[in-house]
Amino acid sequence: MLEIKSIPAFNDNYIWLIQNSDQRCAVVDPGDAKPVLHYIEQHQLTLEAILITHHHNDHIGGVADLVRAFPNVNVVGPKAEPIPTLTHPVEDGDRLELFDETFLVLGLGGHTLGHIGYVGDGKLFCGDVLFSAGCGRIFEGTAQQMFDSLNKLLALPEETEVFCAHEYTASNVAFALAVEPDNELLHQYRDTVNRLRAQNLPTIPTTLRQEKWINPFLRYLQPSVIHSVSSRTKNSDPLSVFTALREWKNEF
């Protein structure tokens, strides 16, 4: 079983550190090297791998400095994106071994065209595709691509832990409550999120099981969600509902 630690960066990023039992580690989406190097030094770890989900600078900005500090580190990331530091370009369906665990690479286009995720050991590192109670903005891809990516994640086991890259949960819950004001589980989750954030504690990881109950972008089949977007789209098919939700969230 791998141990996961969150390293906060910038205003709301999480860099995830994956550690095994013999002081070796990997990090996911290190937008800033400084807090990573501080943590590694403090805990006397050796950095063996960097996993990248997509090319945005708040996810890769620290990679070059980490490579300078650990010249033999493996840098894994999306083959389809312009990331010059990669040593191991990967794509959908590839597998990688990390500390005796096998991780599957998932193609998750939408936020960016080449965005990928990594799932293994019951853990999903999904970058900016799925957030707790939300999903990523569609910068390069299409609504269809993001919709397909989220459905790919929905097919994973419900107990899968979700490690996304940002602490957006409180604002996402506010939007989710605008969509489903009568969702009692959402009200309970809002209270939990508020308690955690008041103590400066992360709301992540979440689980796919929880997200199925509280995330409007995964609940496009629910009558309450369809009703909420009925003034924004003439159609009630899943993709139209999802697209209307994403456009609503953009302006929320």
Curated annotation (Swiss-Prot):
Cofactor binding: number and manner: Binds 2 Zn(2+) ions per subunit.
SMART domains: Lactamase_B
Binding site for Zn(2+) 2: 58-59, 128, 166
Protein residues bound to Zn(2+) 1: 54, 56, 111, 128
Domain of life (superkingdom): Bacteria
Hydrolase in keyword set: yes
Pathway: Secondary metabolite metabolism; methylglyoxal degradation; (R)-lactate from methylglyoxal: step 2/2
Pfam families with a match to the protein in the record: HAGH_C, Lactamase_B
Full protein name: Hydroxyacylglutathione hydrolase 2
Organism expressing this protein natively: Vibrio vulnificus (strain YJ016)
Name of the gene encoding the protein in the UniProt record: gloB2
